[in-house]
């Protein structure tokens, strides 16, 4: 229905690992905000830095032209200091310029193997263009948090806006480490009002059958994606939400990428209602071996509008947009190749 109208262009940007910013290791999707002069500020997560949070300025196809500086967090009593961290994985710009960050939070130790490894999604707010942020708190967790030596990473919080609600998608883990893709939903109006007062909105996970009444903290969300190129078992899809989402105006539907680990593909999903994501296509791939596996995974993609019809934060794109992808060596995590290609809608 939708994928027949998608046209995938050739790469227009290829940045080899040696040409990436010095000591830079991609550890999250870039979040773009277009400035009045046409330049774009990109919020980045850099595992090679302490702290992780960086801002770059560039163009639609060249995100690392200049280093702006760090952006800083008020952790609001949440654990801070390496290896704990906050990542503004998706940044939404309000009409008054206030920025809302959909945040990936980690609290664990790389050195103590008996430590609890905890992942959450939370909300942050900035009122100075993104240089300083306040972390209002966690809105979503999973039941495998607080279990020793369990690595239940919730992903990169790809987020859309539909009918006055944020929908943020994540890796859910049911008891027994059964992984699926689920979502949380929360009101845009309530979120803006709450964050202005450094508080949190009400948040509910997807419960299945069109219902949203499962607690964000303490409940287990139902699968919201049930198919992939590799499986029809929603708990064995081989997809991961370190990715991005947007609304495409000419298609009148929502788009969301999913990375696939050693399959080496980037899958583009389509949805009309933000709840059913049955249609998909492979939109980028790394070179594979004779067994169909790749030395590269493709996490940390993002959308940047190329039509002039989308939002400055790329929560909406027009009939042409740029797809940014990272080809990251699975056996050598700091190794990144950065690619940009143009996608058009017919």
For each predicted feature, which ranges?
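Beta-rich carbohydrate-recognition and catalytic domains
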Residues: 1-84, 92-148, 162-238, 247-294, ...
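Conserved beta-strand position repeated once per blade in WD40 beta-propeller domains
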Residues: 29-32, 88-90, 156-158, 242-244, ...
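Acidic/His-rich structured neighborhood in mature extracellular/periplasmic domains
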Residues: 149-153
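C-terminal structured interaction module
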Residues: 299-305, 311
